[in-house]
């Protein structure tokens, strides 16, 4: 069975299947912020959906970070390093890409193992 969280007509924020939660790309809530602050916002959204998925950041299996400009890599990493679970940093890729909204500096996609109830 597939469980979907926060479903819209276009996409779900999370789909859970066979013990794995697949997340949609999470984006900043305030486009006026700098890369560090936008990354903090995105990570906060990820925390929210991890909780809704009955899991946490220590169970992230993979993260893909999309940056509008690689010049923001250091500031994104600063926010990431403050947030990531100690001794549980997941595999991660960082890619420069043109994002759907030109004011977004970062978008992050993850997969995570869920906690079985």
Swiss-Prot record:
Top-level taxon of the source organism: Bacteria
Name under which the protein is recorded: RutC family protein HD_0322
UniProt-listed InterPro entries: RidA_CS, RutC-like_sf, YjgF/YER057c/UK114, YoaB-like
PROSITE patterns per the UniProt record, alphabetical: UPF0076 (PS01094)
Pfam families for this protein: Ribonuc_L-PSP
Family: Belongs to the RutC family.
């Amino acid at each position: 069975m597939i469980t979907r969280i926060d479903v819209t007509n276009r996409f779900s924020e999370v789909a859970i299947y066979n013990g794995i939660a697949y997340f949609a790309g999470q984006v900043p809530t305030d486009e006026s912020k700098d890369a560090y602050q936008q990354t903090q916002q995105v990570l906060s959204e990820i925390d929210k959906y991890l909780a809704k998925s009955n899991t946490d950041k220590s169970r992230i299996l993979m993260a893909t970070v999309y940056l509008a400009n690689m010049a923001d890599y250091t500031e994104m990493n600063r926010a990431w390093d403050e947030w990531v679970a100690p001794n549980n940093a997941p595999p991660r890729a960082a890619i420069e890409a043109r994002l759907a909204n030109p004011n977004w500096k970062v978008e992050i996609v993850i997969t995570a193992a869920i906690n079985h109830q």
